[in-house]
Amino acid sequence: MNMGIGYNTGLVTEEEAPKSWDDLLDPKWENQIVMTDPSTAGTTKYFVGALLSDSKYGEDYFKKLKENGCELESGTTATHNQVAAGAYKVGIMLDYVTQNLIDEGSPLGFTYLPSDLVSIFSPIGLVEGCANEDNGKLLYDFILSKEGQEILVENNLLSVRNDVEQKGESVDEITKSAMTVDLQSLADNSDEIISTFDSVFK
């Protein structure tokens, strides 16, 4: 899944929509931006951690975002629904959640940033010593099978298989524009990510 910029198509054209994280700092978006509180959503915590750890952004970026009137919602669904309802023109949003709402008729668009796209991995694995290891292996194999990956694509997620047709951006396209993120550092600094963000926004 990928974190980019979603927008209400009734209020913002594709041409007008922000194309970078820095575009959200433009005064024309003042008080028209929403994102999910990272203390309530792991995907947003990942996004915040990725930008905090990048010297191009860091804490200063979030200070500027706050100064431009970015508001917080308590959950991912609420963030997307608020943009769909027109309460905000743009939001820091997830591609698959946005696309699911588009499929339901919501007036939304989504920008895959050409650089510094925050791509979030969704790993699967077996817990060592689990009670039903054989069943776990069957599920693991099914998820990675062509049929299993086609189900993910039907739900607007990306497949890791080359023989499954994607609905939107390809894995190769996303890889080219994705930000490099140190996953171990994010895990090690999870509490610090939230405390730094909260010191700016709350």
Which role does the model predict for each range below?
Residues M1-A87:
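Extracytoplasmic ligand-binding site segments that recognize negatively charged/polar headgroups
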Residues G4-L11, F121-E133, I151-L152:
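A bilobed periplasmic-binding-protein/Venus flytrap-type ligand-binding module shared by bacterial periplasmic
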Residues L11-T13, N31, S39-G42, Y96-Q99, ...:
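Solvent-exposed loop/turn segments at secondary-structure junctions
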Residues L139:
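Substrate/cofactor-recognition hotspot
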Residues G58-D60, V160-K202:
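An extracytoplasmic/periplasmic, membrane-proximal ligand-sensing/linker region
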Residues K89-P107, N156:
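A ligand-binding cleft/hinge motif common to bilobed small-molecule-binding domains
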Residues N31-T36, K63-K66, L72-E73, E104-E128, F142-Q166:
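Periplasmic-binding protein-like
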